[in-house]
Swiss-Prot record:
Main localization (coarse): cytoplasm
Record protein name field: 3-ketoacyl-CoA thiolase
EC number: 2.3.1.16
Native source organism of the sequence: Pseudomonas entomophila (strain L48)
Origin: domain of life: Bacteria
Subcellular location: Cytoplasm
Gene Ontology BP terms: fatty acid beta-oxidation; phenylacetate catabolic process
Keywords associated with the record: Acyltransferase, Cytoplasm, Fatty acid metabolism, Lipid degradation, Lipid metabolism, Transferase
Gene3D superfamilies: 3.40.47.10
Parts forming coiled coils: none
Amino acid sequence: MSLNPRDVVIVDFGRTPMGRSKGGMHRNTRAEDMSAHLISKLLERNDKIDPKEVEDVIWGCVNQTMEQGWNIARMASLMTPIPHTSAAQTVSRLCGSSMSALHTAAQAIMTGNGDVFVIGGVEHMGHVSMMHGVDPNPHLSLHAAKASGMMGLTAEMLGKMHGITREQQDLFGVRSHQLAHKATVEGKFKDEIIPMQGYDENGFLKVFDFDETIRPETTLEGLASLKPAFNPKGGTVTAGTSSQITDGASCMIVMSGQRAMDLGIQPLAVIRSMAVAGVDPAIMGYGPVPSTQKALKRAGLTMADIDFIELNEAFAAQALPVLKDLKVLDKMDEKVNLHGGAIALGHPFGCSGARISGTLLNVMKQNGGTLGVATMCVGLGQGITTVFERV
C-alpha cells in the first residue's frame, strides 16, 4: 500500500521478558531502567533515525509514585541517546495507558505536531504494588456500584450475565499458557523480546530472553482445583483464569508516513483507526466491545475483514463475553491471541497496551495477515482499540 504523508506508521517494537512480580527476574531492576533499556536498544537497531528527531517520549504508567513517579517518561528518556531537547510525558488510562500513549502520538502526527515519537509503557508491580497510595473517594459509591473498583468482581458479574461457565474459563486459561509456551518454543517471540539482565531463582545474574511467567504444565484438572479468588461463595473466577501480576515494559517507534519515506524505512504497519469508549464500571471488562465497534466503523471495516485480534486477557470471564459479542468466539482458534495472552504473560498495567499491539504486529507478520485489531478493557469501565494495517 502507498503511504500518505500524515499516515501514522509503526517502525519497530520491542518489550522486556515478562517477569513474575514475586521474586521474579526483574526484582532488582527499576522501572526506569527497564524503560531506558528498551528505548536505547530500539534506537540502536534503527540507526536511520537520529534520536534528535524524537519529538516526545510518551510513556504509559498507572501507579505513578516511588520509582515510577515524577514523570517516569522523562526519567527514563534522560538515560537514553535521546537528547535533553526532546520532551517526555507520562500518561495513564489505567490498563490502556500505553495504548493511549500510542494514540496521543498518532493524533500529534496526524495534526502535524511532530514526526517521530517513542511510545510505550512500564509497570513494576513487584516494586510498586497495585494499590499503593490509592485512596478511593467513598462518595463514588453513590454513582457506581461499590464493587466496581474490584476488577475480579466485575469479571464475575460479566461472566454471569453472559452465561460463562467455570469450565469455559479454565479451558481459556489452559489455552493461554499452551499457546504462549508453543510460541516460545517455536521462537515466535524472538522478534519482540529484547533480552536484558535479571536474576534467576538462585540469585545469579543472567541474560533473560524469555518470559518466566508461562506455565506449560497447566492443565484443566489443575485449574479446576483452584478456589474462587474474588467471590468465595459461588464465584468462578480464579487466579488461574486471571491475568498475572507481573513486571515488564514495552516500546514502539512511531512516525509519520512522510518521514518514514524520507528515511527509506519500511514500516511494520499503519494505524487505520483508533477509539475509546465507556461502559458501566460494574462490567468494566465489556469495554472492548463498544470501542472496537467504534474503531471498525471509523475505518470502514467490519469484524469479518479482520485477520487477527489481540485482546488483553484481564480475566477469562471477561474475554469470552467480549469475543462472543464481537462475533469472533467461533473463530478464536484462528484469529485471537495466537501466542497466548495476559493469563500466561501477565498484565503489567502501563506496559500492556503497547505490548499487545506489538504482539499483534508480530502475529500478522508471521501469519501473513493484513488487518488486525488490538483491544483491551480498562478499569472502571472503558475500552480502547487500535486497528492496524500491515504495510
